[in-house]
């Protein structure tokens, strides 16, 4: 089914409002100055609006008395902007409609999508698999032979936990913008670069050096030009190192703002999920739709009531197995014997 919305000409973006003062003959502005249209007598005006000539915008109108408005330069620019916005809206609407029609119209074509693993140490059995094809049929849960079912309870795993402790130490190290590394060559006394040229710190006093990581703490008051201490215990860096500290602070601030925005978005997502009316039932419905559980068929009445009605019915077993698996709280029970060897209950009435 081919749908081409872009081929339909939409004249709304070509519509301009006519100047009311011009209609009364009292407009003091010219056609090039007034923000409303001044159409000639040959143009058709309906409800105080006039349609601009599309060919005139392209510079190819050859009509002598065109019934559409040939707008001036400033109105032509406005119409071009309206046309671009209208084209974007048409493309967006066409894409959304095509996506909706893909799911509404059944077809035999199966589109292959990227597969994803579902065996996180739990569902490694061959009986639990997911097809990588999208079909018009809804997903459902089916019963499989008991010999290929896993012995452990089957649960639906959620999102794997994400560990953030690995990069915590490195992030803390990067967030310390008030420290500079001390030049090791300067400590040995053979640094050929001067204090204003070396990219590492050249502290005058050794007590201010932190021996654990060979760094020195920068005086932030000196960076802001307001340190009034006579003997400051913090390092007063030169101009090029001050610029380095300020750049590191700016980057740290941007990182903090981005992290705060991400945390706010995550909190809003969690609050939206908690505000759902039926979060648990919706999850169960998505995992196991109602199409997988067929209604329990009515058992035909028996002529004899000599205890034969208490025999086992295979259809009841299948329904109970599906219900037990849908609860996801306890392992499903499967009998060891085969249900095919049992005599159907309907054949007992003829004996």
UniProtKB/Swiss-Prot annotation:
One of its GO terms (molecular function) is zinc ion binding. SMART domains: ZnF_C3H1 (SM00356). Involved in pre-mRNA alternative splicing regulation. RNA-binding protein that binds to 5'ACACCC-3' core sequence. Belongs to the muscleblind family. PANTHER family: MUSCLEBLIND-LIKE PROTEIN (PTHR12675), MUSCLEBLIND-LIKE PROTEIN 2 (PTHR12675:SF4). Keywords: Cytoplasm, Metal-binding, mRNA processing, mRNA splicing, Nucleus, Repeat, RNA-binding, Zinc, Zinc-finger. This is Muscleblind-like protein 2a. It comes from Takifugu rubripes (Japanese pufferfish). The keyword Signal does not apply.
């Amino acid at each position: 089914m081919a749908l081409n919305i872009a081929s339909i000409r939409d004249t709304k973006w070509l519509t301009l409002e006519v100047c009311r003062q011009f209609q009364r003959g009292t407009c003091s502005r010219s056609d090039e100055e007034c923000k409303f249209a001044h159409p000639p007598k040959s143009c058709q005006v309906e409800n105080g609006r006039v349609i601009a000539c599309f060919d005139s915008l392209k510079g190819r109108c050859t009509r002598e008395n065109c019934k559409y408005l040939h707008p001036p330069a400033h109105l032509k620019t406005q119409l071009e902007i309206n046309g671009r916005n209208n084209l974007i809206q048409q493309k967006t609407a066409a894409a959304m409609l095509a996506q909706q029609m893909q799911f509404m119209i059944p077809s035999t074509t199966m589109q292959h999508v990227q597969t994803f693993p579902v065996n996180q140490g739990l569902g490694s059995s061959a009986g639990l698999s997911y097809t990588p094809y999208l079909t018009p049929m809804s997903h459902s849960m089916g019963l499989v032979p008991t010999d290929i079912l896993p012995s452990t309870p089957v649960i639906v795993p959620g999102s794997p936990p994400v560990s953030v402790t690995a990069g915590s130490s490195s992030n803390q190290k990067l967030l310390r913008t008030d420290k500079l590394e001390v030049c090791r060559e300067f400590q040995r006394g053979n640094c050929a670069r001067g204090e204003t040229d070396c990219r590492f710190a050249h502290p005058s006093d050794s007590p201010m050096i932190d021996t654990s990581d060979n760094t020195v703490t920068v005086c932030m008051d000196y960076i802001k030009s307001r340190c009034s201490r006579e003997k400051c215990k913090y390092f007063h860096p030169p101009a090029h190192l001050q610029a380095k500290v300020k750049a590191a602070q700016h980057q740290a601030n941007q990182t903090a703002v981005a992290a705060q925005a991400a945390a706010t978005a995550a909190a809003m997502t969690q609050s939206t999920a908690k505000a759902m009316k039926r979060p648990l039932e919706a999850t169960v419905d998505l995992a196991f739709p109602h199409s997988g559980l067929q209604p329990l068929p009515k058992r035909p009445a028996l002529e004899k009531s000599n205890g034969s009605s208490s025999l086992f019915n295979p259809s009841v077993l299948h329904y109970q197995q599906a219900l037990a698996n849908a609860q996801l709280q306890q392992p499903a029970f499967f009998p060891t014997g085969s249900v095919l060897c049992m005599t159907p209950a309907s054949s007992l009435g003829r004996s």
